[in-house]
Amino acid sequence: MTAKTAPKVTLWEFFQQLGKTFMLPVALLSFCGIMLGIGSSLSSHDVITLIPVLGNPVLQAIFTWMSKIGSFAFSFLPVMFCIAIPLGLARENKGVAAFAGFIGYAVMNLAVNFWLTNKGILPTTDAAVLKANNIQSILGIQSIDTGILGAVIAGIIVWMLHERFHNIRLPDALAFFGGTRFVPIISSLVMGLVGLVIPLVWPIFAMGISGLGHMINSAGDFGPMLFGTGERLLLPFGLHHILVALIRFTDAGGTQEVCGQTVSGALTIFQAQLSCPTTHGFSESATRFLSQGKMPAFLGGLPGAALAMYHCARPENRHKIKGLLISGLIACVVGGTTEPLEFLFLFVAPVLYVIHALLTGLGFTVMSVLGVTIGNTDGNIIDFVVFGILHGLSTKWYMVPVVAAIWFVVYYVIFRFAITRFNLKTPGRDSEVASSIEKAVAGAPGKSGYNVPAILEALGGADNIVSLDNCITRLRLSVKDMSLVNVQALKDNRAIGVVQLNQHNLQVVIGPQVQSVKDEMAGLMHTVQA
């Protein structure tokens, strides 16, 4: 019996990869959140009273349908994570890894149910007993609610089993069960044992998470600032997803009862309140970690920084960088994707980025102090309209333009002063940058709109790339020889920035079209290596 050992990765690389896997369920969460937000707001009594035509039965049926569809992602959140993690981490046979992830998570909960039944805790309908043991219905199974953290742990274990056994060779008599077929088999066995351990160790995990949540809550209005600043500071390293998931989906982001059910995590609480017909208004303790905190920086601050960079560019270069700044501005304000603007100053002035992180965190605190209650994930204009304006004055959405305008002025003044006082080389400040922009625009774009062959060559060619993946805005790569990577050539071909993590791992910041660039590059690599 033999098996192929998976390549070893450092802890840093592992957390990089783990954070990347969160993007698949988070992307669906964002879409479902908008569906739920529109459906619930337009079917609310207050909106119908204000706009009677919306009370039409056909329209109300559509809005109710939107709410139902939108609530899907939040009802099956742990399941999505336990599937997405093996899918994203697996190097080969990703479909098998995802399938095994679901099997492992379901079997783990069945084993927990077995333990609870064997101990005489189940079956019961006593609400006090269920609450005392944190028992919920998961996939129709009464089990201990381990939330997102339990799903993440299950996903990681299944991924490790997949990497260890997906190429296993069994004796001829058992050969049918070898290879990829063995992965869900071993996953069900191992996760069945893990499920027996969960009731013994989970109270310790729960206490730790609750303690973290208590610490954040005890910080009062300073807590959101710690979160907002921390997220920005971790973003260049791709580790912010871990912090965000912890606050959004675990007890660290708070725990409340909504419609008779105990719900944990800031985003989960907000979405539960959205879909609960008896809820009037949203929890300030939950929304203070969500979209509203980003809005001062995203809708005001970064546009102010972009205008400052435009005004500080040489007059003859302004028309050359206008497209770069406008595309970054649209990505930020409309899509909530800030890297295209942030990476324009991150590398030339790291101190400015730290100031930006602090001001972003301060925005979280200011929104919290003002009692704004706008939830969801992105902090963009869509969230502002759907979860702010459409839900009425009770969200205090009218405070957002006021604070955003102040942040616009503050950012503009700080950036203009810093750029001119310290002669920072932001886009358009010197002739070399201008020629690089011209060169990039003059390149031969492919289907992605980028000169992917030139980007691949700047990375040292297909033979130099060990692994290729992407997140929302960045290519994530492992290379054999970092000395073969030409950073300037990457920037000449419209890369916004390059983050070298260590001797073999780097990230190339592309922007919103990174998925198209990655797919085109993967196809090109396959052709070259075939």
From Swiss-Prot:
InterPro entries: Glu_permease_IIB, PTrfase_EIIB_Cys, PTS_EIIC, PTS_EIIC_1, PTS_Glucose_EIICBA, PTS_IIB_1, PTS_Mal/Glc-sp_IIBC_component, PTS_maltose/Glc_sub_IIC. The active site is at C471 (phosphocysteine intermediate). One of its GO terms (cellular component) is plasma membrane. Its main location: membrane. Keywords: Cell inner membrane, Cell membrane, Kinase, Membrane, Phosphotransferase system, Sugar transport, Transferase, Transmembrane, Transmembrane helix, Transport. It holds the Pfam family PTS_EIIB. This is PTS system maltose-specific EIICB component. The EIIC domain type-1 forms the PTS system translocation channel and contains the specific substrate-binding site. The PTS EIIB type-1 domain is phosphorylated by phospho-EIIA on a cysteinyl residue. Then, it transfers the phosphoryl group to the sugar substrate concomitantly with the sugar uptake processed by the PTS EIIC type-1 domain. The chain crosses the membrane at residues 22-42, 69-89, 96-116, 138-158, 189-209, 289-309, 321-341, 343-363, 369-389, 399-419. Its EC number is 2.7.1.208. The lineage of its organism: Bacteria, Pseudomonadati, Pseudomonadota, Gammaproteobacteria, Enterobacterales. Induction: By maltose. Repressed by MalI. It is an enzyme of class 2 (transferase). Residues 449-530 form the PTS EIIB type-1 domain.
